[in-house]
From Swiss-Prot:
Gene designation per UniProt: rbfA
Subcellular location(s) of the protein: Cytoplasm
NCBIfam families to which the protein is assigned, alphabetical: rbfA
Protein name in the entry: Ribosome-binding factor A
Record-level GO cellular component terms: cytosol
Matches recorded under PANTHER family: RIBOSOME-BINDING FACTOR A, CHLOROPLASTIC-RELATED
Family matches, as Gene3D superfamilies: 3.30.300.20
UniProt KW keywords: Cytoplasm, Ribosome biogenesis
UniProt similarity note: Belongs to the RbfA family.
Gene Ontology molecular-function annotations: ribosomal small subunit binding
Subunit and partners: Monomer. Binds 30S ribosomal subunits, but not 50S ribosomal subunits or 70S ribosomes.
Function: One of several proteins that assist in the late maturation steps of the functional core of the 30S ribosomal subunit. Associates with free 30S ribosomal subunits (but not with 30S subunits that are part of 70S ribosomes or polysomes). Required for efficient processing of 16S rRNA. May interact with the 5'-terminal helix region of 16S rRNA.
One of the protein's GO biological processes: maturation of SSU-rRNA
């Protein structure tokens, strides 16, 4: 059972929890919206951590996304220092923030599926008459 999860994935999960808390309660940047940390991928050598995030309700506004990216980039040093205090690692990875497109892509796919279902229903309804 212990071999199922790699060390880097366990570290990524821990960093995700800590980052979510730190961003919500300790980062005091007015540019920062309601950020959700979706995933943290840590390199095998712990040299860097890729943090994938979304912003609640602002997926379609590029200027808001750019402001959030700038706020997170400016808070990297603070977040890394606080993570080093909370998570006991010999080396704390460098943080790289990326906006997570998967939520936007998922909602777009869901809309396309709903549209296809409606089209099928209207076609089937016309054929029955």
């Amino acid at each position: 059972m212990a071999g199922e999860f790699s060390r880097t994935s366990r570290i990524g999960d821990q960093l995700q929890k800590e980052l979510a808390s730190l961003i919500q309660f300790e980062v005091k940047d007015p540019r920062l919206g309601l950020v959700t940390v979706n995933e943290v991928r840590v390199a095998k050598d712990l040299g860097y951590a890729d943090i994938y995030y979304t912003v609640l309700g602002k997926d379609d506004q590029p200027e808001v996304l750019a402001e959030n990216q700038a706020a997170l980039d400016s808070a990297k040093g603070f977040l890394r220092r606080r993570l080093a205090q909370e998570v006991k690692l010999r080396v704390m990875p460098h943080l790289r923030f990326h906006y997570d497109q998967s939520v936007v892509n998922g909602s777009r796919m869901s809309a396309l599926i709903d549209e296809a279902i409606r089209d099928d229903e209207t076609k089937n309804g016309n054929e029955d008459e």
